[in-house]
Curated annotation (Swiss-Prot):
SUPFAM superfamilies: Major capsid protein VP5 (SSF103417). InterPro entries: Herpes_MCP, Herpes_MCP_upper_sf. Keywords: Capsid protein, Host nucleus, T=16 icosahedral capsid protein, Virion. The lineage of its organism: Viruses, Duplodnaviria, Heunggongvirae, Peploviricota, Herviviricetes. Coiled coil: none annotated. Pfam families: Herpes_MCP. Its main location: virion. It comes from the Viruses. This is Major capsid protein.
């Protein structure tokens, strides 16, 4: 049988020299002819394998195409027949170091040869195609049959060639793709390479904390300044410099063959710069003067491995062209089939072909410059240089900038109306990706702020209890508070025991907090900082049963937030906002306020006025009896001393304004009383910001907005039992008062039984109860007007009515018969002196006696001795949630007491000071009237304060259960005596409940806290890759083709075994994120809906739950148990998607509650939104105890500031932010796993430690590779460290920093800055701010539109 050799399946004509296209065309034509021979009619021709023929063809086409692409500049191609059997290769290179000759008796360096080891990386690629059985059958038929058979045969042959061409094309693309992936695996980002080149360390030198931190900071800065450098501007020098830095930052190849890829001027290409088509086109446009098309001499052959006897690689030499068809078939089936001589066609003198390439001139070097768009076009594989990027942004809402420190840095003059929206911003403005202005205000964040979890302290308290207690000095500062509850009837008996003991009372945490200024509060030496974990709850330590326990109580009102977190000026600015909203037309009350202030602070206040107050005690009939006396007292003191009497008593003011309009008193004095009442009503109308007609849970909605309207807050001075519509527990003795235990006063008859019990603990009340309107006005007076105008220089007092009446009035002639009573004068010196002091010295004895008798006539309406009542009541339904369900607020009120504004001396034995409330506990009055208190003040002079520093008796000092706490008394002690101060105290009574927050937010009133908004956006980006010439060797052999026959088809599998060897002396390739291709998310204002994230939580009260969900925009009710279980287990989205999306995928903004005093500079540079840095380069993250300490130990300063934190509500362990966004707590919260949280990466401890370990490893490994293999460990393999890809794609997570977003608190500032393109500089305009962006996205977006 004739043995067909390759003569009929090999080229018959030599291909034109150095022409790639001719090679490809010629090879394809010969394959077609050879296939006809192969499928001819002679069976003897089957001795040449069809699979081998396909493999040789694919090899030829595959490599010819590879050599024509610019990426081949970075390759060094080597043939090795046994590469498929090689799993791990190790190539040794002997490199002789260059030397410099020296003189002047300096010893020259010795000849040095370094052996560098490079490891191979196996990466096979494969492709397959199917040929149907029908097609193969037609191929096997002879060409000599009918015309139809020949046509079918030719069609079948074309089918084979199409499949073969597609497979060969796939191998071409696969080879380039595999090589590109290999380059990327050893191409660290440029910012890493530059940082390591600047901070080179010896490979055996351990990095210090300072070095590691410096490198980390340099990495961060270079990353942020190099991102999207093609989009930032069209500055040629800037872009040229970055590209030049890319080229200079990499090392040369070990194989420096200048014959490959050389221009006609014999200038070798130093490397190749590759990128996606968009970036390359942009570079071509910008750097056109440096770009040219040159004819380059490209290789069309590859090297060959030579194997020694020991089967080890000993050298690399360049050998013949790839095994062409001629040489293969000549030796096929012979003894010389494994010996391939040099090709006769491509000899040494003709081993290169001319190829046109785009080149870029960088300095004195020439690099290839192109894209691989044609490789990936219309394929299902993305260009590896087109990558995704995830960036997280943060920006503030509601940060307060004090007007006294306000200034403007705006170059262009921006005029803002003088409105409180501009003076206390409650909105933030920014642009989305389509340059549409977005606005977020407090009403928009209600789905996060009004969620039940936010108003539940259960987990906060539990986590704080699980922590170790303070030790040492901090224990003595924080853990000395004792809660003393005592029978109200015994409080008066033991009232002065504290002062008699002369022991200093330890300050509670609230007092300590409010003694600090804003800057000191955030410092690590603030011992109370660990207790500030929640904006709506006070946390502290108490002593109970000789053990230290954690106490958590609701703050109830905005005014109870510590002043360093909500300062005085903020409360006043917020009050102005309420005034503006209410459109309050403030009349001129200045003169009235001035005279009232002078009267309240005057040291010469008549004691007769206190006696009259005691006799009248708010009773209209008693007042009418004493009307003449009262009018004379008022007239004398107003005309002679310019003092307005009875301005310390609400009941007296109301009685005077209602019943003395008949010119009994001077008109000016009466006008002041009327102005006082008008002012109180004005305050009431101003703070009524909700719809008074709306009801919720059977109560007016305004009750939920401001505590002054809430019946649960009682007036501190009462003379008759108030309405108890809220079922408060009122106690005067051992048992709570009820309708049966409270007795009624019978003034019109001889009430002997009441007179006998006048000094007992039995409580008597009038038949007439004050109206709800009167009760609200009285609370406004005592909690707002009086403290603001007296600066807390008032004191509660009790009166021993029994002894007072007996000593002053049960003497002659008061107890004489009527005739004798009318005729005889009064002889009581005490009473006469009181009358002369109160009425003036001009009265005769007869006149003073007449006045005394008038006083005596009012005794028919006398009240009982003063009592202290304890009021224990739960909060409103909106605040009764979570742990607060069982919370009972405590108030102590004076029943039949009075408010002193000056000490009583003459009647001291009948009146006793009762410091029962911080508004009414003036140490001056107390010390003057009680010797024990005066001694106490002399012993501890620092306690002589009106701001809460004067200690109250322990049963009355229940700070954490009271409604008004230390911040109230601190403000009222130092506030100016003005209408604004009164309004501010009233506004501070705004509640911290979800209903109150919703009402205020929807009315554009600041709710008392700020917010940090965090959003993650996704981007498609384009990267540039630079690689030096011959940076990587590609080891290959012929493709292996196998056939798998099936019933209906035969599958042919092509496998190309490849192995890659890095040839760089160091990092020979690098990448850079150059161009923003697409913004995938909308960069908008969609707020995270916590009702979907935590779906099963609901408020305790069903009506409250329904109201909240409706007013914050949650349409669906709470899910059923089965729905909730499915959501928790499998995840779910509890809302329908919007019908129209104008701006793409919605990015979610999450809310972190933040103090309004957070430094605005915190938002002007990249920081961790939790308020404390989490990237711990100064700590070994493998030491988890030290790492956790760096994260959560606030006794240490933050790594970026001199403070411990900027937001304790998020940075402390177990704080509100930590609970919401730390995934470790989600099991306790029943979390919806389908909800994406951009904040989780900054709060989850396990993720933070993991990324820190990865960052630590990345820096350490790159430092080891910062030197080349010539001056470091020659075994180092220069490839990207693990985690580099994640670092580049999610830099914010690894850096633990969010980026500032271009935003402003006022739309005018945003438009002004956008108009000038000044978006990267942060500015301040008095109370408004504009935050500059780190990456100029606005400029990038504008240039791309």
């Amino acid at each position: 049988m004739e043995n067909w050799q390759a003569t009929e399946i090999l080229p018959k004509i030599e291909a034109p020299l150095n022409i790639f296209n001719d090679i490809k065309t010629y090879t394809a034509e010969q394959l077609f002819d050879n296939l006809r021979i192969y499928f001819g009619d002679d069976p003897s021709r089957y001795n040449i394998s069809f699979e081998a023929l396909l493999g040789i063809y694919c090899n030829k086409i595959e490599w010819i195409n590879f050599f024509t692409t610019p990426i081949a500049v970075a390759a060094n191609v080597i043939r090795f027949n046994d590469v498929s059997r090689m799993t791990l290769g190790k190539v040794l290179f002997f490199i002789q170091l260059p030397r410099v000759a020296t003189g002047n008796d300096v010893t020259a360096s010795k000849e040095t040869t370094i052996m560098v080891a490079k490891h191979s990386e196996k990466h096979p690629i494969n492709i397959s195609f199917d040929l149907s059985a029908a097609c193969l059958e037609h191929l096997e038929n002879t060409f000599k049959n009918t015309v139809i058979d020949q046509i079918l045969n030719i069609n079948a042959l074309h089918t084979v060639l199409r499949s073969l061409k597609n497979s060969a094309d796939s191998l071409e693309r696969g080879l380039i793709h595999a090589f590109m992936q290999t380059l990327l695996r050893k191409s660290p980002p440029q910012f890493i390479v530059l940082t390591m080149n600047e901070n080179k360390v010896h490979n055996k030198q351990a990095l210090s904390r300072v070095q590691r931190s410096n490198m980390f900071q340099s990495l961060k800065n270079r990353l942020l300044t190099s991102l999207f450098f093609l989009n930032r501007n069209n500055n040629i020098s800037y872009i040229y410099r970055i590209l030049n830095d890319m080229m200079e930052s990499v090392t040369e190849s070990i194989l420096n063959d200048t014959n490959n890829y050389t221009s006609k001027e014999n200038v070798p290409l130093d490397g190749v710069l590759l990128g996606p088509i968009g970036s390359i086109q942009k570079l071509t446009s910008i750097l056109s003067q440096y770009i040219s098309t040159q004819v380059v001499s490209a290789p069309i052959s590859y090297g060959h491995f030579i194997m020694g006897k020991e089967n080890a690689v000993t050298a690399i030499a360049y050998r013949a062209i790839m095994a062409d068809f001629t040489q293969f078939t000549v030796n096929a089936g012979t003894e010389q089939q494994d010996t391939n001589n040099k090709s006769e066609i491509f000899d040494k003198s003709r081993a290169y072909a001319d190829l046109k390439l785009n080149t870029l001139k960088l300095g004195d070097k020439l690099v290839a410059f192109d894209h691989l768009h044609k490789v990936y076009k219309n394929t299902d594989v993305n260009d590896p240089l087109e990558q995704s990027l995830q960036l997280t942004f943060f920006f503030p809402l509601g940060i307060y900038i004090p007007s006294e420190t306000g200034f403007s840095t705006m170059e262009t003059r921006v005029k803002l109306n003088d409105t409180m929206e501009n003076n206390l911003p409650t909105s933030v403005f920014f642009h989305n990706k389509d340059q549409v202005v977005q606005r977020i205000d407090f009403a928009d964040i209600l789905p996060s702020v009004c969620h039940p979890i936010v108003h539940d302290s259960t987990i906060v308290e539990r986590l704080m209890k699980s922590e170790p207690l303070p030790t040492g000095h901090r224990f003595s500062q924080l853990c000395q508070l004792k809660i003393t509850r005592e029978n109200p009837a015994r409080i008066l008996q033991t009232l002065y025991n504290l002062y008699e003991s002369r022991q200093e009372v330890p300050k509670n945490t609230n007092v300590l907090k409010n003694e600090l200024n804003i800057e000191d509060f955030y410092k690590p030496d603030n011992p109370t900082l660990p207790t500030e974990r929640h904006p709506f709850f006070d946390l502290t330590y108490i002593q109970k049963n000789r053990a230290t326990e954690v106490l958590c109580t609701p703050r109830i009102m905005i005014g109870n937030i510590p002043l360093p977190l909500a300062p005085v000026s903020f409360h006043e600015a917020r009050t102005n906002q309420i005034l503006e909203h209410a459109k309050t037309n403030c009349q001129n009350y200045d003169f009235t306020l001035k005279i009232v202030t002078e009267s309240l602070t005057s040291g010469s206040y008549p004691e007769l006025a206190y006696v009259i107050e005691t006799l009248v005690h708010g009773n209209k009939h008693a007042f009418m009896i004493l009307k003449q006396v009262i009018s004379q007292c008022i007239s004398y003191w107003f005309n002679m001393k310019h003092i307005l009497l009875f301005c310390n008593s609400f009941e007296m003011i109301m009685l005077i304004s209602n019943h003395m309009g008949d010119e009994l008193i001077p008109g000016a004095a009466f006008a002041h009383y009327r102005n006082l009442v008008s002012l109180i009503r004005l305050v009431k109308r101003t703070i009524s910001i909700s719809n008074l007609n709306e009801q919720l849970c059977g109560e007016p909605l305004v009750n939920f907005a401001n505590a002054l309207f809430d019946g649960r807050l009682f007036c501190p001075f009462v003379h008759t039992m108030p309405r108890n519509d809220t079922n408060a527990k009122i106690t005067a003795d051992d048992t709570p008062l009820t309708q049966n235990t409270v007795r009624v006063r019978n003034y019109e008859i001889s009430d002997v039984q009441r007179m006998n019990l006048i000094d007992s603990s039995v409580v008597f009340t009038d038949n007439d109860r004050p109206s709800n309107e009167t009760t609200i006005l009285s609370k406004i007076f005592y909690f707002c007007v009086l403290p603001a105008l007296s600066n807390n220089k008032a004191c509660g007092a009790g009166v021993n009515v029994k002894e007072l009446v007996l000593d002053l009035f049960y003497t002659e002639p008061f107890i004489s018969p009527d005739d004798y009573f009318q005729e005889n004068p009064i002889t009581s010196d005490v009473l006469m002196s009181l009358i002369r002091e109160g009425m003036g010295p001009g009265y005769t004895v007869a006149n003073t006696s007449c006045i005394a008798k008038q006083l005596f006539k009012s005794l028919i309406y006398i009240n009982e001795n003063t009592k202290i009542l304890e009021v224990e009541v739960s909060l409103d339904p909106a605040q009764r949630h979570g742990n607060s369900v069982h919370f009972q607020s405590l108030q102590h009120i004076l029943y039949n007491g009075l408010c002193l504004i000056s000490p009583i001396t003459t009647l001291r034995r009948y009146y006793q000071p009762i410091p029962f409330h911080r508004f009414f506990s003036d140490p001056g009055i107390c010390g003057t009237m009680n010797a024990d208190i005066q001694v106490f003040l002399n012993t501890f002079p620092h306690c002589q304060r009106n701001d809460g520093g004067f200690p109250l008796p322990p049963p009355l000092a229940l700070e954490f259960y009271n409604w008004q706490r230390t911040p109230f008394s601190v403000y009222s002690a130092f506030c100016p005596n003005s209408l604004l101060s009164i309004m501010t105290l009233a506004a501070m009574h705004s509640k911290l409940s979800p209903v109150a927050i919703a009402i205020q937010s929807k009315n554009k009133i600041h709710p008392g806290f700020a917010a940090t908004l965090v959003r993650t956006d996704n981007f498609d980006v384009e990267c540039l890759l630079y690689s030096s010439r011959a940076a990587t060797s590609i080891i290959l052999d012929d493709p292996t083709v196998t056939a798998e026959a099936k019933d209906i088809a035969t599958t042919y599998n092509f496998t190309q075994h490849l192995s890659f060897v890095d040839m760089g002396l160091g990092f020979s390739s690098t990448t850079a994120t150059a161009n923003l291709k697409r913004i995938k998310s909308d960069m908008g204002s969609k707020i995270q809906n916590l009702f979907s994230a935590f779906p099963i939580h609901a408020f305790t009260n069903a009506d409250i739950n329904t109201w909240i969900r409706h007013h914050v925009g949650i349409e669906k009710p709470n899910p059923s148990e089965s729905e909730a279980l499915n959501i928790i287990t499998f995840g779910g989205i509890n809302k329908n998607p919007p019908s129209i999306l104008l701006h793409g995928q919605q990015a979610i903004c999450e809310v972190i509650l933040t103090p309004v005093t957070t430094n605005i500079n915190f938002f002007k540079s990249p920081h961790n939104p939790r308020g404390r840095e989490s990237c711990m380069m100064g700590t070994d993250p493998h030491n988890e105890e030290a790492a956790r300490k760096a994260l959560y130990d606030h006794t240490q300063t933050d790594s970026d500031t001199f403070a411990a934190t900027t937001n304790p509500w998020a940075s402390l362990p177990g704080s509100l932010g930590d609970i919401l966004y730390n995934t470790a707590h989600r099991e306790q919260l029943c979390y919806n796993p389908k909800t994406y949280s951009p904040n989780a990466q900054f709060f989850t401890e396990s993720d933070i430690l993991k990324t820190n370990k990865m960052m630590y490893k990345v820096i350490s490994e790159y430092c080891m590779k910062s030197n080349s293999c010539l001056n470091s460990d020659s075994e180092i393999q220069y490839s990207c460290s693990e985690g580099t890809d994640s670092f580049v794609s999610r830099p914010c997570q690894f850096l633990q920093n969010a980026l500032p977003l271009h935003c402003s608190s006022n739309q005018a500032l945003l438009e002004s800055r956008s108009k000038t393109g000044n978006t990267q500089i942060s500015e301040t305009h008095y109370c408004n701010y504009a935050i500059g962006e780190t990456i100029p996205f606005q400029l990038i977006i504008e240039s791309s539109i």
